């Protein structure tokens, strides 16, 4: 939030030229695959569609201010044009991007966004068990900001990086800012009640919070905030407020996850961002409802799969104390031409989300060994991503989700700080006991390697029931039996770093036909 910046959303009345070439009027958020991406048959339309809207230039002083446009999520590639001139291109359907449009503005403006979700070999994801809905499915906004402002065009980030470190009962908080134009930076840290707890000046300073109140997971997710102001000749030209949490965590391969020095076993769920009938074009109320349900089942961790989610949802995770695994959609099939895209999506993920206390690890890939031809290039890509994460973020761990069939000795499972497996033992293959054998065997071979379950589950249909449930019957009873076993199994293996059910909610995979339900 910022009083200095004037923000207007551009959500209503866009002209949309769709797959069949006809033009209709739509409001954002919008996807053209809400229906055909959920009805099965693996035939949802992938290609380029055009969104167009007209807007009057906002009031601003051309000598002292600029106008920026921000897109929170356009899947998958966007080509933005204003009044006939190209503004920017963006590859990656899940992250924020911005552009300075001051020079191109007229009194009346025509904004065109060409959105493309067609198959290619450069932009992830291309092969995966979920639908890649095309569209402008998150907010679009205009921002009037002073020429002197915290940086807006560095990988969609906030221009501020906050790194709290617990030191006994206190916390040292390093605040680094970047800005365009001139100005002196002044920093103010506030507690949850809005009282000032520390102040300082400079683009890279370390402040102390005495008797710091820790962000302590679901029990006590306490948040501080940091106000950064850019001051020119005594006038505040730009201001930005960012929430942060003070916490420490570690993973012990023999004892599991620790939060603020105490054992804190992580058991939770994975989440996709789509809804039936709407696809990925969802509302804040739906995010709230998802979180309420996740809290209700007693989860304390969420794997936000398989891509960057809406900022609003990471904020919710901060507020309710969920421990989060955040990841990029480097998935199923390694594409040698896609390396640059994995790097840019990871930079965006980290830079846009660094300040969220909920996030403890960056996931580099998911089931990448399923259909990868060039193993050497794939491993190299993983090493590069792993190094990038450590270089950009000294405070968090790296992880990945491995495909069951790749086995415990696969080299891709030994690059990141931790590893988790997608194992459906007792669902895709018979035998609950296989879970105990898998965990035990891995732990025996690699006692110093943190091990978790990134996916496990059994599909249950609310309309299918049985007194004698068996594997593959899609009954709720079999699903319940499976989860009861798994919870007892995790108790027997308390050293696991985290477990995530696949999935908290139904999601669309147009190629699937599970339990007689095409498309999910």
Where do the PLM segments sit?
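Short, Lys/Arg-enriched N-terminal segments with co-localized hydrophobic residues
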Residues: 1-3
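Accessory beta-strand-rich segments of carbohydrate-active enzymes
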Residues: 6-19, 42, 46-153, 180-182, ...
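Aromatic- and glycine-enriched glycan-recognition loops and surfaces
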Residues: 43-50, 61-65, 219-222, 251, ...
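Short strand-turn-strand beta-turns centered on an Asx-Gly dipeptide
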Residues: 81-87, 190-192, 233, 260
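Extended acidic/polar, glycine-enriched regions
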Residues: 103-108, 176-253
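Surface beta-strand/loop "capping" patches
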Residues: 147-181
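N-terminal carbohydrate-binding accessory modules
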Residues: 153-154, 158-162, 227-296, 315, ...
């Amino acid at each position: 939030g910022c009083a200095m910046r004037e923000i207007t959303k551009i959500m209503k009345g866009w002209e949309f030229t769709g797959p069949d070439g006809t033009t209709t009027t739509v409001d954002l958020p919008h996807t053209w695959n809400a229906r055909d991406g959920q009805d099965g048959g693996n035939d949802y339309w992938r290609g380029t569609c055009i969104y167009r809207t007209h807007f009057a230039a906002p009031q601003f002083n051309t000598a002292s201010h600029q106008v920026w446009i921000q897109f929170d999520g356009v899947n998958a590639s966007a080509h933005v044009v204003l009044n006939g001139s190209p503004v920017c291109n963006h590859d990656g359907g899940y992250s924020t991007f911005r552009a300075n449009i001051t020079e191109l503005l007229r009194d009346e403006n025509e904004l065109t966004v060409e959105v493309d979700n067609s198959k290619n070999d450069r932009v992830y994801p291309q092969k995966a068990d979920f639908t890649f809905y095309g569209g402008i499915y998150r907010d679009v906004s205009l921002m009037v900001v002073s020429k002197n402002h915290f940086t807006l065009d560095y990988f969609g980030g906030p221009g501020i990086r906050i790194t709290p470190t617990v030191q006994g009962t206190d916390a040292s908080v390093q605040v680094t800012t970047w800005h365009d134009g001139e100005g002196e930076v002044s920093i103010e840290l506030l507690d949850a009640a809005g009282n000032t707890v520390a102040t300082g000046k400079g683009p890279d300073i370390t402040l102390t919070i005495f008797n710091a109140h820790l962000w302590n997971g679901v029990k006590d997710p306490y948040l501080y905030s940091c106000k950064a102001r850019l001051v020119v000749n005594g006038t505040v030209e730009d201001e930005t407020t960012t929430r942060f949490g003070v916490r420490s965590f570690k993973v012990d391969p023999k004892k599991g996850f620790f939060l603020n020095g105490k054992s804190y076993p992580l058991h939770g769920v994975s989440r996709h961002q789509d809804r039936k009938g709407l696809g990925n074009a969802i509302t804040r109320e739906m995010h709230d409802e998802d979180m309420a349900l996740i809290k209700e089942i007693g989860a304390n961790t969420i794997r936000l799969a398989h891509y960057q989610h809406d900022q609003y949802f990471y904020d919710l995770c901060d507020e309710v104390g969920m421990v989060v695994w955040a990841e990029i959609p480097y998935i199923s099939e390694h594409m040698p031409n896609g390396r640059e895209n994995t790097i840019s999506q990871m930079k965006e993920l980290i830079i846009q989300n660094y300040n969220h206390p909920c996030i403890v690890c960056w996931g580099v890939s998911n089931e990448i060994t399923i259909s990868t031809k060039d193993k050497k290039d794939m491993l190299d890509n993983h090493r590069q991503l792993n190094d990038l994460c450590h270089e950009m973020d000294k405070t968090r761990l790296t992880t990945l989700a491995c495909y069951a069939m790749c086995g415990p000795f696969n080299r891709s499972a030994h690059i990141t700080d931790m590893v988790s497996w997608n194992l459906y033992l007792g669902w895709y293959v018979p035998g609950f006991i296989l879970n105990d054998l898998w965990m035990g065997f891995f732990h025996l071979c690699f006692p110093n390697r943190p091990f978790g379950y990134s996916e496990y589950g059994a599909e249950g249909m609310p309309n299918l029931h049985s007194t004698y449930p068996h594997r593959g019957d899609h009954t709720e009873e079999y699903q319940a039996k499976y989860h009861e076993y798994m919870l007892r199994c995790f108790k027997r293996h308390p050293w696991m770093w985290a477990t995530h059910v696949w999935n908290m909610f139904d999601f669309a995979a147009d190629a699937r036909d599970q339990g007689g339900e095409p498309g999910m």
